[in-house]
């Protein structure tokens, strides 16, 4: 599978100025977007998934950014840190109550940056997350935003087996939805995403 991560990072760096910022990241997982660490002051990465944090640590070492990041294995709601910005990395839709998550983040920083699937993203449909994504954007839109931007991206897969391996953890709905790709090669799925600054 491939997405144009470099383009997503470029869009993120244009959307928000991370220079000399203290950043709290939520759901930083495997560290796909760690490039902002090069210009930031420091980063506190919170994730409740130890395996994801281990992968992040490995990526930080490879990138030479390990000294700028503090990894925190915790439930986000149990943290009480201070920073310039709290960034949700494609995870707000996974929060049980997205509005409560944003409100908690607002106690930690004056700026809240959300990166997530766009509500009408085809990819969100295939991975059976469209309702969760709509709920998270409804929470975002219920608040005063400083700016919001939608982007178009693509998910690329060599064949059905590759897409199946990616979505099987999402459950039976996802597996049914990708059935249309059986026996197909070079599969392209639109993945619109957006950034919101609150």
Positions of predicted regions on the chain:
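Short, well-ordered alpha-helix to beta-strand connector turns
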Residues: 20, 40-41, 83, 109-110
């Amino acid at each position: 599978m491939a997405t144009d991560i470099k383009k997503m990072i470029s869009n993120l760096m244009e959307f928000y100025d991370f220079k000399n910022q203290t950043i709290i990241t939520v759901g930083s997982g495997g560290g796909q977007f760690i490039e902002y660490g090069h210009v930031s002051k420091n980063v506190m990465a919170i994730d409740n998934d130890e395996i994801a944090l281990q992968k992040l640590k490995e990526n930080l070492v490879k990138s030479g950014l390990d000294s700028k990041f503090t990894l925190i294995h915790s439930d986000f709601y149990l943290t009480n840190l201070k920073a310039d910005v709290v960034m949700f990395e494609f995870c707000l839709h996974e929060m049980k109550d997205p509005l409560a998550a944003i409100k908690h983040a607002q106690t930690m920083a004056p700026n809240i940056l959300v990166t997530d699937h766009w509500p009408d993203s085809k990819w969100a449909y295939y991975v059976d997350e469209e309702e969760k994504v709509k709920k998270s954007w409804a929470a975002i839109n219920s608040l005063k935003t400083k700016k919001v931007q939608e982007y178009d991206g693509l998910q690329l897969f060599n064949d059905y087996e590759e897409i199946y391996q990616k979505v099987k953890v999402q459950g039976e709905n996802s597996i049914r939805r990708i059935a249309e790709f059986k026996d197909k090669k070079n599969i392209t799925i639109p993945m619109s995403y957006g950034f919101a600054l609150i």
